[in-house]
Amino acid sequence: MPRVKRGVTARARHKKVLKLAKGYYGARSRTYRVAVQAVTKAGQYAYRDRRQKKRQFRQLWIARINAAARQNGLSYSRFINGLKKASIEIDRKILADIAVFDKVVFATLVEKAKEALN
């Protein structure tokens, strides 16, 4: 069998990794060995944070809903309970959006929740 020289493959692999590491600080963007580690770690962070992003946004929405509900004299948990009893099914993302951008509509939702609780 003929000898296989792997220069083309190695060069392509190095180029691919260094392209992914473009913009990194210092040797991380220039040295292949360090760039491989940096790109691998970046991938791990990206994988983890794609999952954390969902949790963090839900936390943000709940904090916004809670703040708006308390301005209207109701705690978050009682507000959500009131909405469920009034059979109003709006998810937290939309509720947070309404709380921030349309305070009048949110106030009416709070009133409906209060009525359902009584």
Swiss-Prot record:
NCBIfam families: rplT_bact (TIGR01032). This is Large ribosomal subunit protein bL20. Belongs to the bacterial ribosomal protein bL20 family. It comes from Shewanella baltica (strain OS155 / ATCC BAA-1091). It holds the Pfam family Ribosomal_L20. Binds directly to 23S ribosomal RNA and is necessary for the in vitro assembly process of the 50S ribosomal subunit. It is not involved in the protein synthesizing functions of that subunit. It comes from the Bacteria. The gene is rplT. PROSITE patterns: RIBOSOMAL_L20. SUPFAM superfamilies: Ribosomal protein L20 (SSF74731). Keywords: Ribonucleoprotein, Ribosomal protein, RNA-binding, rRNA-binding. GO terms for molecular function: rRNA binding; structural constituent of ribosome. The lineage of its organism: Bacteria, Pseudomonadati, Pseudomonadota, Gammaproteobacteria, Alteromonadales. HAMAP family: Ribosomal_bL20.
